[in-house]
Amino acid sequence: NPPAIFKSYCEIIVTYFPFDEQNCSMKLGTWTYDGTVVAIYPEGPRPDLSNYMQSGEWTLKDYRGFWHSVNYSCCLDTPYLDITYHFILLRLPLYFIVNVIIPC
């Protein structure tokens, strides 16, 4: 089992449905501890997908992780770290055709 399962909301833009692709992001960081106390770094430019479960409706077209260090106006000498992952999801139209169009 993975150490954690994250569920996230992604706004879907349906302009080209069912031949669309979506860009979903997930930002991981901490507001409790700053970058002088905790260090977070991605293991590489792409997330580990060893526990990824494929879907009949979507496929991963691209995915990357980016490390950020931000100094906010409240505390300019204190960095706050995060890793933001971007996932480009490509809809598989066969799922829509088989489950919606054909039954009609």
UniProtKB/Swiss-Prot annotation:
GO molecular function: extracellular ligand-gated monoatomic ion channel activity; transmembrane signaling receptor activity
Glycan-carrying positions: 23
Name used for this protein in its record: Acetylcholine receptor subunit alpha
SUPFAM superfamilies: Nicotinic receptor ligand binding domain-like
Record's function text: Upon acetylcholine binding, the AChR responds by an extensive change in conformation that affects all subunits and leads to opening of an ion-conducting channel across the plasma membrane.
Assigned protein family: Belongs to the ligand-gated ion channel (TC 1.A.9) family. Acetylcholine receptor (TC 1.A.9.1) subfamily. Alpha-1/CHRNA1 sub-subfamily.
Reaction catalyzed: K(+)(in) = K(+)(out); Na(+)(in) = Na(+)(out)
GO cellular component, one term: postsynaptic membrane
Transmembrane segments: none
Matching Pfam families: Neur_chan_LBD
Localization of this protein: Postsynaptic cell membrane; Cell membrane
Primary location group: membrane
Membrane topology: Multi-pass membrane protein
UniProt KW keywords: Cell membrane, Disulfide bond, Glycoprotein, Ion channel, Ion transport, Ligand-gated ion channel, Membrane, Postsynaptic cell membrane, Receptor, Synapse, Transport
Disulfide bonds: 10-24, 74-75
InterPro entries from the UniProt entry: Neur_chan_lig-bd, Neur_chan_lig-bd_sf, Neur_channel, Neurotransmitter_ion_chnl_CS
Keyword Repeat: no
Lineage of source species: Eukaryota, Metazoa, Chordata, Craniata, Vertebrata
Stored PROSITE patterns: NEUROTR_ION_CHANNEL
Signal peptide: none
UniProt subunit comment: One of the alpha chains that assemble within the acetylcholine receptor, a pentamer of two alpha chains, a beta, a delta, and a gamma or epsilon chains.
Parts of the chain on the Extracellular side: 1-104
